[in-house]
Amino acid sequence: MAERGGESGAERGGDRGDFGRGFGGGRGGGRGRDRGPRGRGRRGGRASEETKWVPVTKLGRLVADNKITKLEQIYLHSLPVKEYQIIDHLVGPTLKDEVMKIMPVQKQTRAGQRTRFKAFVVVGDGNGHVGLGVKCSKEVATAIRGAIILAKLSVVPVRRGYWGNKIGKPHTVPCKVTGKCGSVTVRMVPAPRGSGIVAARVPKKVLQFAGIDDVFTSSRGSTKTLGNFVKATFDCLQKTYGFLTPEFWKETRFSRSPYQEHTDFLSTKAVSATKVITEGEDQA
């Protein structure tokens, strides 16, 4: 019986045994075979294509043209970073990110409770740069993606120092520093080389991303609130550049801003862009 059923299926043109070709197996069963990918496959292929970064800010144009090659040049003149691709271009290969927590949050409306997801993401290169991003969205993936972008936009420099003699590379915080968010207070104390990061799980991860090897920490308040705990740690690291030490007492020699140095480049680009727009309008 099985052989007869298989023969009947083969006679009908089917290659699946007794089931034939399914719907439309006899007439037009091969329609559209040579038309290439259709439906979701084609749409997914378009989404996977990498789009080239086209900078829209002055700083982005300078970075894309390799006029600025280090983040320190941006921090020195306090230039605002409005495009996350700038961070990717300068420290992209060494930058790591980690999702610290995803928590549901609710808002009461007339129609009922509206639930969204809040993501906390930390990024850092382990060499004196760290950022924190918080994003709320209807979907988890969208919240994580947005938090990563915000974390890159908020990357700040972390100042490192020594506990005793200045031997080797800086390994700890330069002095005692305190950060606060809500009821949570985090205090960091310099530690001798080899002590490691003496901290809870949440601040330890942030300190590792910042590139600090040895530090003593203490915290107080509602540290169970992870969001405030992370923000207090990030605030602590931000304040490492907020004080003057004897090495900064000498007279400061100011240098020109990148915008002033590359004025001709920026004006040329702007003029060429306006010419293209006007020519297109004239042709239309």
UniProtKB/Swiss-Prot annotation:
UniProt feature, compositional bias: Gly residues: 20-29
GO MF entry, a single one: structural constituent of ribosome
UniProt region (Disordered), positions on chain: 1-51
Residue span(s) of domain S5 DRBM: 95-158
Biased composition (Basic and acidic residues): 1-19
Keyword Ribonucleoprotein: yes
InterPro entries, per database record: Ribosomal_Su5_D2-typ_SF, Ribosomal_uS5, Ribosomal_uS5_C, Ribosomal_uS5_euk/arc, Ribosomal_uS5_N, Ribosomal_uS5_N_CS, Ribsml_uS5_D2-typ_fold_subgr
GO cellular component: cytosolic small ribosomal subunit; nucleus; plant-type cell wall; plasmodesma
NCBIfam families referenced in this protein's UniProt entry, alphabetically: uS5_euk_arch
Family of this protein: Belongs to the universal ribosomal protein uS5 family.
Name of the protein described by the UniProt record: Small ribosomal subunit protein uS5y/uS5u/uS5v
